[in-house]
Amino acid sequence: MVIDSDKYFIHSNAWWWGVDYRIIRRDGAGIVGINFDNSMPETCYIEGLSVVEHERGKGVGRSLLELCELIARQEGKTFLSLSVEKDHPWLVEWYKRMGFFIYSIEDHTFLMIKCLK
């Protein structure tokens, strides 16, 4: 995996269930966590994506999401998935603009999916 190490710090952990990554912008503008769970061989789950408030609207979230896609593709995954709280409708719309769609509706969350192939 080739990622600009001057711009991002990447930490990975291997677990009995798979591997997870934490990707942090070195300038502190944002962080994302992704999981590769062996029980879901085609899917990369985005555990959380956060951008500090004063950096929002500057492409930080998009760049972190693009890194998730890059890693997922390199790992041979077919889908990216994530959950969005129902009380954050603006995030649902943002992820839709990034190519995700609502796959299922849970009690308090929307499960969203993006096809990578």
Cite the ranges covered by each PLM segment.
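Conserved acetyl-CoA-binding loop-helix of GNAT-fold acetyltransferases
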Residues: V51, G57-L70, R97
